[in-house]
Structure formats: structure tokens, C-alpha cells
Amino acid sequence: MEHLKAFDDEINAFLDNMFGPRDSRVRGWFMLDSYLPTFFLTVMYLLSIWLGNKYMKNRPALSLRGILTLYNLGITLLSAYMLAELILSTWEGGYNLQCQDLTSAGEADIRVAKVLWWYYFSKSVEFLDTIFFVLRKKTSQITFLHVYHHASMFNIWWCVLNWIPCGQSFFGPTLNSFIHILMYSYYGLSVFPSMHKYLWWKKYLTQAQLVQFVLTITHTMSAVVKPCGFPFGCLIFQSSYMLTLVILFLNFYVQTYRKKPMKKDMQEPPAGKEVKNGFSKAYFTAANGVMNKKAQ
């Protein structure tokens, strides 16, 4: 335990030296004072993917229909709460859409910070997206984009909550909460085969995510053009990170919806097929069929 505490002290000292004093308003909040819980949960997440795939290799895929229904409903409701609370609290604080500092809104800033803590915590809950893929043997959906997005968001938002827990930080989570209401409603409906014929709007979810990232970059850079005291380095980092998501999601969109099929066998997956988190098993099944024909 002494070695663990020493490791914790070293990490926290390093982060404090890098980013400066933490925001005192969030001291003592669950999982924020030490980086270790966030770090170890992320390591466990990555190990679970690797070990889980090995464990499931020679075992049948699990259905998990009931669990997935409850899970998607829970994330949808949490996202709805965060969206409503962020709109109400920023309205109460008179937040400036172009640039909002960290202190001028008083109690409204604390209210925003509390919602953003739930946003941070929800990123650890969303690790279950990938775990469910593993248990259902949906390995084609566990892409670099998927894992990068899930792992990085959880760690980045630990930093956000400690140093910039309100102000300009509100915008991205507000948009993301709205997008997640749509996404997890879609995922929940996709569990039921009878609903598949109504799920023709998958690609529009990806388009909405891309719009979300572009709007977040625009909002972030507006505070660079007209500064209000929000940390400049944080603005540049957030814009750069969002740009990586734009590139990765745009690549996925082009590969999935715009690229011409190589063969007639490889067709656009119909809306009736099961879709989860922007990936369709039917597409990869068709691709494998083409390769198998070539090998014969």
C-alpha cells in the first residue's frame, strides 16, 4: 500500500506541476482527488477487451437482450437528465455562448460542475459498450476508433473536472448528451428484431456526431478569437482532440457509406440488420464471403 500511495503522490504531483493548481470547488468529489481510480479503470477496460476476446473465442456468443435493454434505457435517461440540467444551469448563470469564464456565474458554475461530474462518470459506465461487444462476439465493432474514443474521453474528463469544471467546458457535453439520447435509443430499439425495419436512420447518427464535433471545435475556437480568461492551453487541446475524432469518424463514414462496393456481393447493409454503435455485422460478413470465393 505504501508503494501505491507513493505512486499516487508522484502522479498527482506531476499533473499539478503540468496544469497548475486544481479547482478547489471540486476537492473531495468522488474519484477526482486521485488519478489512480481513473487510470486503473482504464487499464481494466483495455485488459477486459484483450482477455475477454480470448475467453470468448471458443464459446458461443451471449444474447444479453434483457441487460442491453435496461442498459440502453439507463444511458438514455441519464443523458436526458444531463441535457436538461446543463441547459437550465447555464441559462440560470447567464452563460455567454461565445466564451464563458470559470468563476463569474457563482452558484450556477457549481451546478454545471456537478452535471459535468456525472458526464465524466458516465464515460466509465460506457465502457460496458465494449464489454457487451466482447460477450456477444461482435469483434468487428471493436475498432481503434471505438476503443480510442471510449478510453480517451474518460481520462480527459478527469482532467477537465479537476482544472476547468465549468464555464466554456459546458458546450461539448450539452451536445453530446443530446446525441446520446438519439444513439442509445437507437441501440435499445435495435435489440428487438421487430423494430429493425424502422431503423433506417443509422447513417444520420454518424452525420450528427460529425456535426457535433465541428460545432464543438467552432465553439472552442471562438474563445480563442474573443478570450474571456478561460485557459488558452485547454482550448487548443480540446480543439486538437476534437479534430482527431472528426478525422476518425469521417473515415468511418466514408468507408461505410460512400465507398463503392468492390463486388456485387458486398452490398450496403440493409436497415433491417442489427446495428450497434455505427457498425454492421452484415457488411463484414459479405466481405468475408467475397474473400472466401477468391480462395476457392
UniProtKB/Swiss-Prot annotation:
Span(s) of short sequence motif Di-lysine motif: 293-296
Major location category of this protein: endoplasmic reticulum
EC class: transferase
Catalytic activity: a very-long-chain acyl-CoA + malonyl-CoA + H(+) = a very-long-chain 3-oxoacyl-CoA + CO2 + CoA; (5Z,8Z,11Z,14Z)-eicosatetraenoyl-CoA + malonyl-CoA + H(+) = (7Z,10Z,13Z,16Z)-3-oxodocosatetraenoyl-CoA + CO2 + CoA; (7Z,10Z,13Z,16Z)-docosatetraenoyl-CoA + malonyl-CoA + H(+) = (9Z,12Z,15Z,18Z)-3-oxotetracosatetraenoyl-CoA + CO2 + CoA; (5Z,8Z,11Z,14Z,17Z)-eicosapentaenoyl-CoA + malonyl-CoA + H(+) = 3-oxo-(7Z,10Z,13Z,16Z,19Z)-docosapentaenoyl-CoA + CO2 + CoA
Biological process per Gene Ontology, one example term: fatty acid elongation, polyunsaturated fatty acid
Pfam families on file: ELO
Keyword annotations of the record: Endoplasmic reticulum, Fatty acid biosynthesis, Fatty acid metabolism, Lipid biosynthesis, Lipid metabolism, Membrane, Transferase, Transmembrane, Transmembrane helix
E.C. number: 2.3.1.199
Disulfide links within the chain: none
Expression tissues: Liver and testis.
InterPro entries: ELO_CS, ELO_fam, ELOVL2
GO cellular component: endoplasmic reticulum; endoplasmic reticulum membrane
Localisation: Endoplasmic reticulum membrane
Membrane topology: Multi-pass membrane protein
TM annotation in the entry: 29-49, 67-87, 115-135, 153-173, 175-195, 208-225, 230-250
Pathways involved: Lipid metabolism; polyunsaturated fatty acid biosynthesis
GO MF terms, alphabetically ordered: fatty acid elongase activity
PROSITE patterns: ELO
Function: Catalyzes the first and rate-limiting reaction of the four reactions that constitute the long-chain fatty acids elongation cycle. This endoplasmic reticulum-bound enzymatic process allows the addition of 2 carbons to the chain of long- and very long-chain fatty acids (VLCFAs) per cycle. Condensing enzyme that catalyzes the synthesis of polyunsaturated very long chain fatty acid (C20- and C22-PUFA), acting specifically toward polyunsaturated acyl-CoA with the higher activity toward C20:4(n-6) acyl-CoA.
Subunit (UniProt): Interacts with TECR.
Family (UniProt): Belongs to the ELO family. ELOVL2 subfamily.
Domain notes: The C-terminal di-lysine motif may confer endoplasmic reticulum localization.
Protein name per its UniProtKB record: Very long chain fatty acid elongase 2
Phylogenetic placement of the source organism: Eukaryota, Metazoa, Chordata, Craniata, Vertebrata
Gene: ELOVL2
